[in-house]
UniProtKB/Swiss-Prot annotation:
Predominant location: membrane
InterPro entries: Ankyrin_rpt, Ankyrin_rpt-contain_sf
Source organism phylogeny: Eukaryota, Metazoa, Chordata, Craniata, Vertebrata
Gene3D superfamilies: Ankyrin repeat-containing domain
Spans of repeat ANK: 11-40, 44-73, 77-103, 107-138
UniProt-listed SUPFAM superfamilies: Ankyrin repeat
The protein's name in its UniProt record: Ankyrin repeat domain-containing protein 46
Pfam families: Ank_2 (PF12796)
Keyword vocabulary terms for this entry: ANK repeat, Membrane, Repeat, Transmembrane, Transmembrane helix
Record bears the keyword Transferase: no
Organism: Pongo abelii
């Protein structure tokens, strides 16, 4: 299970990156105005945008963007600045400037997956979940016409009304959704083939227990005893 947490490195010999770590807006601005590369990287491939976003320094993120920082830059593990975010305002800034909320790193993890692993606060998790839902629906891509958006909203409203009239259905859908999310995270963390192997082992154990209890091998027909 691999993920990045940038608080493990608070020192660098690159002045601009150190200013981003320290949250020193004025020094960052002077360095950029003097010609420092806004996309300079540390030993892990992280830019100043990665480091500032990870610490919630949205003002420095905006400053770097103004001086030409690449919002799509990834570190050596494929993480964008959004993968390292743990603050609402930095997430909103990056997404509003075109960064995809469902982008995956080299391990296939989205910003939401990494945020959950790091244990960031619930407001951030809820925001990332909401943005992912909107991305799936297409609202963040700008591909829907006003008519399509209205139709989608009406459909969701009708479904919500139906759920309110049927509380048992609403509760059941909530449990199913929670189970589905937990199962997806379990498969992502463990890996598909390991999950498949685990299921196979459990099946063998079940057959062994059944044989131990009943003395009869499952799926094997009992042969009639010969009477001499």
């Amino acid at each position: 299970m691999s993920y990045v947490f940038v608080n493990d490195s608070s020192q660098t010999n690159v002045p601009l990156l150190q200013a981003c770590i320290d949250g020193d807006f004025n020094y960052s601005k002077r360095l950029l105005e003097s010609g420092f590369d806004p996309n300079i990287r540390d030993s892990r491939g992280r830019t100043g945008l990665h480091l500032a976003a990870a610490r919630g320094n949205v003002d420095i993120c905006q400053l770097l963007h103004k001086f030409g920082a690449d919002l799509l830059a990834t570190d050596y593990q494929g993480n964008t600045a959004l993968h390292l975010c743990g603050h609402v305002d930095t997430i909103q800034f990056l997404v509003s400037n075109g960064l995809k909320i469902d982008i995956c790193n080299h391990q296939g993890a989205t910003p939401l997956v990494l945020a959950k692993r790091r244990g960031v606060n619930k407001d951030v998790i809820r925001l990332l979940e909401f943005l992912e839902e909107q991305e799936v629906k297409g609202f963040n891509r700008g591909t829907h016409s006003k008519l399509e958006t209205m139709q989608t909203a009406e459909s969701e409203s009708a479904m919500e009304s139906h759920s309110l009239l049927n509380p048992n259905l609403q509760q059941g859908e909530g449990v199913l959704s929670s189970f589905r999310t937990t199962w997806q995270e379990f498969v992502e963390d463990l890996g598909f083939w390991r999950v498949l192997l685990l299921i196979f082992v459990i099946a063998l154990l079940s057959l062994g227990i059944a044989y131990y209890v009943s003395g009869v091998l499952p799926f094997v027909e009992n042969q009639p005893e010969l009477v001499h």
